[in-house]
């Protein structure tokens, strides 16, 4: 999850975009808001989880809206408390290293180049409507290199059924991939 902004709509003020991307399916959820207050982020996360399902982990940067308060640095903010309440483990990337969250940063670039810079928005309401249209289009049509057809051929998937040594870090990913292919 990442927060993009502030961005500006000519004659209608600023907005922020909360972008969430599922690392396995590359489905996205885009939520625009006027402010980056933690209650807006928390409400957006609830809508995201209702739409996409609740994840096991949520990788986030150290944005103040995500982590809590500078005034009370040892207290948990609303977004963190929401994650913990629903059993979602927040994973923070190191400060000043956005490349550690490369998948969502790549989507932010796609959002900027293929959506925000290619259209003119007369109002914030129009932007919210069009961002949901972009979200639906992206989830249906946009493909990343990891989902290329050559990687989905059966001969490349033979390793999924192989037994890995105990404690091998691919075990969890293989289980997730098996459930992904079993459902399709």
Annotate each PLM feature.
Residues 3-17, 23-126, 132, 136-137:
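RNase H-like DDE/DDD metal-dependent nuclease/strand-transfer catalytic core used by mobile genetic elements
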